[in-house]
Amino acid sequence: MKEELIERFTRYVKIDTQSNEDSHTVPTTPGQIEFGKLLVEELKEVGLTEVTMDDNGYVMATLPANTDKDVPVIGFLAHLDTATDFTGKNVKPQIHENFDGNAITLNEELNIVLTPEQFPELPSYKGHTIITTDGTTLLGADDKAGLTEIMVAMNYLIHNPQIKHGKIRVAFTPDEEIGRGPAHFDVEAFGASFAYMMDGGPLGGLEYESFNAAGAKLTFNGTNTHPGTAKNKMRNATKLAMEFNGHLPVEEAPEYTEGYEGFYHLLSLNGDVEQSKAYYIIRDFDRKNFEARKNTIENIVKQMQEKYGQDAVVLEMNDQYYNMLEKIEPVREIVDIAYEAMKSLNIEPNIHPIRGGTDGSQLSYMGLPTPNIFTGGENYHGKFEYVSVDVMEKAVQVIIEIARRFEEQA
């Protein structure tokens, strides 16, 4: 199993599938189409049926039941795309067998080193086989680790028919990293009662609470004149943006929050005297606090409009997804089975809220309750990203055990 995990994963990450927020196509990048087509062929080779890829790049497949019991149809999902935060082109995965727990020089020429001082969890992987980058790209374990694990688990179940299971549906979705993953997902065609998203992090991760999320685009309009004669004439749009940001609580930013704490995050700011644009994301687990944060944004805008004029600040704000807990609670047994599956494999479940987005959040509100399970990756979205193959193997075992338990309990 370990060899198959390494072979598939290292091959998959070399395909550039970064999504593109500025694109209006679906998927947003051709690499995702290329990858999807490859997976269609490999799913068929493994032995799955009803393998499809629609015009929007969504890949679906079926592992038929091998039991006569009336078992609910369950799904396993992962996403095709990788993050846009750092380059994902020309990924060169580096395999470190029997890792000694010490610092790893990723790139000697550029002096890029993965150190326990910077990443304290690193020594806990001593003895594992880990896969890192070469320091010049992200790795893409988010979410090609999860995708690989699903492929390997399906292959294992097909070759081990003594493990009884109901019908299993598999789906690989595009554009998750830019929040568009479920936009064209056909829940009815997928046909599962519920699903598990293989898109988590370290060993034991089991997540069924997510942020409530919104995005806010602010355009600040200034008046540019010659600075030598600017008195009482110039209005500096960049300073308006700075003023707006100054009204937000400093301590309620990502770098100062954890656990169940929400935040405002200035994702980008660019412009000049004439016009500046800022993009914020707003996050909170509590729906009332979430609405209060959006009201704070709106109130600051109103205050600045009263001070500088209606055209000085233009706000576009939209909700992105909601806390999936509300949709998971009525079918809590899907969490319980995943929890029990981990315990039976001597994995200690680590239940914590997702401080980020996952397709599962939106899918849960579309009628497909979808908690999130660990995949074995660390330090996603950057050059220090790595994955433990040993933990990936555990994730495969969890998928298999979940399928087995649903059949056993039917």
Curated annotation (Swiss-Prot):
Q: What is this protein called?
A: Peptidase T
Q: What does this protein do?
A: Cleaves the N-terminal amino acid of tripeptides.
Q: What InterPro entries does the record point to?
A: ArgE/DapE_CS, Bact_exopeptidase_dim_dom, Peptidase_M20, Peptidase_M20_dimer, Peptidase_M20B
Gene of this entry: pepT
Relay the cofactor remark from the entry. Answer: Binds 2 Zn(2+) ions per subunit.
Q: Which organism is it from?
A: Bacillus anthracis
Q: Entry's Pfam families?
A: M20_dimer, Peptidase_M20
GO terms, biological process: peptide catabolic process; proteolysis
Any Gene Ontology CC annotation = cytosol
Mind giving the lineage of the organism this protein is from? Bacteria, Bacillati, Bacillota, Bacilli, Bacillales
Keyword DNA repair on entry: no
Decide whether keyword Protease is in the record. yes
Name the chemical reaction catalysed here.
Release of the N-terminal residue from a tripeptide
- Where is this gene product found? Cytoplasm
Gene Ontology molecular function: any one: zinc ion binding
Q: Which UniProt keywords apply?
A: Aminopeptidase, Cytoplasm, Hydrolase, Metal-binding, Metalloprotease, Protease, Zinc
Gene3D superfamilies attached to this UniProt entry: 3.30.70.360, Zn peptidases
The Swiss-Prot or TrEMBL record lists the needed cofactor(s) as: Zn(2+)
Residues holding Zn(2+) 1: 79, 142, 199
